[in-house]
Amino acid sequence: DFINFVKELSELNNQNDSNIDKLKKAKMKNDATVEDNLVALIAKIGEKITIRRVKFFDKSKGANFSYVHSAVEKGIGKIISVVKLDGVSKNNEQVGNKIAMHVAATSPLAIDKEGINKNLIDKELEIIKEEIKNSGKPAEMVDKISKGKIEKFLNDNSLLNQTWIMDPKKKVSDILKENSSADKEIKVLNFVKYKVG
């Protein structure tokens, strides 16, 4: 029942532009709304289920690649990641699936450093500076050390700057370059990772 609900929900999401409110009000095949079907499903299986987030990747400009970890059925699992790439051709499609797997394993916050939320960076910098001060380092060293640590935070959390999980000597950006052709550069347009729970 749950798997069938999820499959139909996914189809409806594609028709509702990832608008969670529209999705909850949408009619399912049995003519009841998603919300009503969700209540009935919760009553039937006795598990708390919520629809917290949705995302839709259209098929215009670029190609979508996915990875499902701990799959219970095709396209359904405990962790799923989807990556939208531009510049991928038939002979280098495997790179899309590998990058989707990388996203599932590493949980980047953004494609590049500039995409990471400024408030999050400020908060992280505050924590880093406090840790350095509490470690007994001289006050004049705090800024210098914190710059290096915040740079590491940005690299670790921006997809293009992350260390490639399949070869720690490379970054994700290196993998994209290696798989690009002379006339087609592979670019990450978007990505998402969802985990059950």
Where are these predicted regions, by residue range?
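N-terminal assembly/interaction segments in proteins that build large macromolecular machines
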Residues: 1-197
